[in-house]
Amino acid sequence: MPAHHTQHQMKNLCSTCSLRELCLPVELMPAEFDRLDAVIRQSRRLKKGEYLFRAGEPFTSLFAIRAGFFKTTVASQDGRDQVTGFFMSGELIGMDGICSQTHSCDAVALEDSEVCELPFVHIEELGHHIPSLQTHFFRLLSREIVRDQGVMLLLGNMRAEERLAAFLLNLSNRLYSRGFAANDFILRMSREEIGSYLGLKLETVSRTLSKFHHEGLISVEHKHIKLLDPQSLKKMVSGCAHAV
């Protein structure tokens, strides 16, 4: 895949971004937005398949996804890429590097995407002067911990049907919070990538999607998914969908 040095760059402002309420605390004042705008580096546009960052690279910034979809992966012992997460517009990516100051995973664009770069040293400094910003990032870190716990529960205790139902509901909820249709969406990732994330074989993912389709729970046409009976899917996962 192409390295990220080919990315196009341009300047965007948090204060005028339609996704700012997803990335940032809603109570920021205009003057605080101005201070934040001043530290944001030029945003990047990435083509599908380009790396935003790679495991082992120095951690310097968080990235707010302005448009597009990403996956994060780590190399397993046998050399295969293990998918560890999917990130969409309005979400922050790159927090894996805060602890060790190096990234622990690769981040790859699943479609043409755009991100805003937030230099961490400046964001950390701003947090001392804007308490709501610091609190917001603590909440984001907490959400990552909760999600990791949810994935551990999912991989350890849930059947294939429950894992896939939880995954679809989680996507639905996240898309809905961004103003998209909750029950009608396109999967940006492959079935193989879904299987890697959920700890399922490709054949199991395809078979389970077909099972849901024949049972009238969903409609499947290639990557186009419609949730026809989301309530039955929710009953299947017993409230665990929010964590994956």
Language-model-detected regions and their locations in the chain:
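Cyclic nucleotide-binding regulatory module and flanking cytosolic helices
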Residues: M1-K48, L92-I93, G97-I98
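Glycine- and acidic-residue-biased ligand/ion/polar-headgroup-sensing regions
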Residues: G49, T60-T73, S89-G90
